[in-house]
Amino acid sequence: MANCVVRDWQGKETGKASLDLKVAKETTALDLMHRAVLRQQAHTRQGTASTLTRSEVRGGGRKPYKQKGTGRARQGSIRTPLRPGGGIVFGPKPRSYNLAMNRKERRLALRTALMARIDDVTVVKDFGTSLEAPKTREIVDALGRLGIEADSKVLIVLGTPSEVLRRSVRNLEKVKLIAANQLNVFDLLHANALVLGEEALATIQEVYGDD
């Protein structure tokens, strides 16, 4: 179990919150998270790269010159892979790069990643709920009050981010805002600082705490 300090929008301490999640064994945790990240990145690949083999390249049906008597190397087609404009040997073809991983393993990897970064987590009550209009400066100032620089990699996880909040954050290149149900291993490990809304923390505990 980990205890986190809860702060308000002004950065003042308002209480404490706990997070109790089962994690992987120390001997297998690194491999588990690594496989989860590889799977996540593999699933983002379109897999549409495609090349033409010598049989698919247009032309090349006629033998370019006779077999003997020219002093040159024998050629059967101008579309041989040995010539410019020829086919590609063992080039990529459209395929799926998806990797399989059990649901229990995926959930365990996410819990392990979150608990591994618990020292970098800042829990905030009512993050950005007072914003009436999109204002990037308000987000930068709020992060500053929490001791977090907006030009570092920051992951903000909220229960249900409002449109005003999304528009306020989108101008910050290194700040990413996601909902609690979009939590993933890569973002957890990639960020330098994590900001969790109090309601998001409760959602995470409810969804992942029973395993």
Swiss-Prot record:
A Pfam family this chain is assigned to: Ribosomal_L4
The keyword Ribonucleoprotein belongs to this UniProt entry's keyword annotation: yes
GO biological process, one term: translation
Database matches in PANTHER family: 50S RIBOSOMAL PROTEIN L4 (PTHR10746), LARGE RIBOSOMAL SUBUNIT PROTEIN UL4C (PTHR10746:SF17)
Function: One of the primary rRNA binding proteins, this protein initially binds near the 5'-end of the 23S rRNA. It is important during the early stages of 50S assembly. It makes multiple contacts with different domains of the 23S rRNA in the assembled 50S subunit and ribosome.
UniProt family annotation: Belongs to the universal ribosomal protein uL4 family.
Name of protein: Large ribosomal subunit protein uL4
Gene behind this protein: rplD
